[in-house]
Amino acid sequence: MRGRVSPLMLLLGILVLASVSATQAKSPYRKTENPCAQRCLQSCQQEPDDLKQKACESRCTKLEYDPRCVYDTGATNQRHPPGERTRGRQPGDYDDDRRQPRREEGGRWGPAEPREREREEDWRQPREDWRRPSHQQPRKIRPEGREGEQEWGTPGSEVREETSRNNPFYFPSRRFSTRYGNQNGRIRVLQRFDQRSKQFQNLQNHRIVQIEARPNTLVLPKHADADNILVIQQGQATVTVANGNNRKSFNLDEGHALRIPSGFISYILNRHDNQNLRVAKISMPVNTPGQFEDFFPASSRDQSSYLQGFSRNTLEAAFNAEFNEIRRVLLEENAGGEQEERGQRRRSTRSSDNEGVIVKVSKEHVQELTKHAKSVSKKGSEEEDITNPINLRDGEPDLSNNFGRLFEVKPDKKNPQLQDLDMMLTCVEIKEGALMLPHFNSKAMVIVVVNKGTGNLELVAVRKEQQQRGRREQEWEEEEEDEEEEGSNREVRRYTARLKEGDVFIMPAAHPVAINASSELHLLGFGINAENNHRIFLAGDKDNVIDQIEKQAKDLAFPGSGEQVEKLIKNQRESHFVSARPQSQSPSSPEKEDQEEENQGGKGPLLSILKAFN
């Protein structure tokens, strides 16, 4: 009896097997070569309900080509979307970096309504006149993937390299967002520096703005709750600045700068018939740190007039006129009669593409707006007025040779426009194939805008050694909060970036920097905390701080003797700007030099900093 199976038990077993087979037939296990999606599909098999299981599998299928679904590095036969080379997300990768641009509407810049659209718009350069010539188009850069690479040197002196995507000091042009824009031009604002990295808290109240305008256009009058310094990067502009008692107009060309104090009304005219106007501006808000607002007296598609914010009684009392007249003249609402015809004629000249804060103007308007404008002399104005323009190329350059030159305007009594702001303006021109030698600023923190050309940046920093490589940027910033912990190991990091027109990078005080020009490179610098700042070079015939170190100290600090260090320094006969091509090597073989270095051993952190530039 014990060996016999009950017919009832046998029937129940058959029913269970049939049920399992039916379940597997309805929901077959789908295979995928993406390990991330594979694990998701496996988890779906635990769902008891068929509908929930199918919904789970549908979600997992979408992960197969999702860039957030990281492929395992050890997986074979990885599948990628056609034509795309996929890699894991690295520190510094932002969500907006993965967005794809939408189709441009009407071939013009749109208003800055949703911020996402602004970011997507910055992925591409504008069409027609705004597009660079084909020979100036920036190349698509593939990440070098050298993060964490151990460089040459003695144990404990390795140099870690961070490329453009992981470089907190580098702000590509796509990080600008468009505040106002139409087919006549656009005004863009760079993201806040302190939002990128907490080490830029001193720059919290400094914002970079770019203005681009087509020929014969006008940026409408406005004022802002921020002090501004603008610099003409390209083209010819007539800038008018006015307060309650005075008005000044200046004809500005490339290299001219002008301060617009907070609350002063200003408007910018591109008076050239064929050339686009480009202006770089640094804004320092006076109300809320890091935030500023523009106030327009006239309404446009992008911005309403601040006069509309006042009540009817206030406007009638302020202008001593009836509200209907105020509305017709200033607000263009419900106009009638002769005023309506005049408004229609004005609106006919301002088509839908011409509505906005940048408008097209006639040649007659250009002549009237430039009639009383003053030109800027090479020596600048002798009057001590903060609204007088500055000529960045005034006089002889501060540094100059066959490979480049540098002009600098310092915050002193000669330049009251900069003195109370404690700022300096720097203009650097590096010839193609030249190198601006490694150097640093003793006190100033410099915001650099790439005005023209292409090049490569190398910036050296000393950071707390990071045990786990490849963290997300948020975790990396949290790690920076503990940078000043005593006793923690420090490592030298090299931050690199490929520079192109419109990019911005930061030169913190005391951080060594070298700049290599792959084409003629023009840079514009806004220096913060510039009073008593000194530019200190680490190589070259003149202004070389290492050459000032005593021979005995050199002998203790470097692997070679003091005499060898001094002899090496004298090999470079140029100063400040040199050829980027390395000079001929000494007769001794590299193997012999490495052996001598190993025998000597590293003697100090200065050697590690110098190694970062190799």
Curated annotation (Swiss-Prot):
Keywords: Allergen, Glycoprotein, Signal. Residues 169-327, 390-566 form the Cupin type-1 domain. Residues 1-25 form the signal peptide. Pfam families: Cupin_1. It comes from the Eukaryota. Residues 475-486 have a biased composition (Acidic residues). SMART domains: Cupin_1 (SM00835). Glycans are attached at residue 516. Residues 81-132, 464-474 have a biased composition (Basic and acidic residues). Residues 72-177, 334-356, 372-397, 464-491, 572-614 are annotated as: Disordered. Belongs to the 7S seed storage protein family. This is Allergen Ara h 1, clone P17. It comes from Arachis hypogaea (Peanut).
